[in-house]
């Protein structure tokens, strides 16, 4: 009997056995989710101290070494798999990458506006660093390596309209959101159904 038939629900003609590989991925991904949202948890502090944290603090650095790292290495590996289902709800903008994180629509700005990303002077800049709170009104100040050509003006207008819908809230924390659930929170069930 084929494994995919065994894993089908009983009402669909299967045996109703859960796909263990998928369940394992979901449970490992749950650890990644907990790492992103539990900022003060003791276990997170221990893991962060042992492996280091990537800038922004959403996940640990890549795990290297041969001894004693197998479990966290497997958990970290699932971070890459779940990353496409994450978005960022911007608060202060201190932990969200302006070009590379998904905070302003369905994809990162570097994918929505690749030709602008190419001429950007700061490709790894944080959202807060592109936000200018000075002057008459708050505004965005992305820096580019050259003046825009005539044929690029319409694209720049679309770009500016897209980001102008968002404002940095300095007193609020940046948050991660699981986009496949209505609540924005990760769940094993939602992961499996996705």
Annotated model-derived regions:
Residues 1-194:
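A helix-boundary/hinge signal
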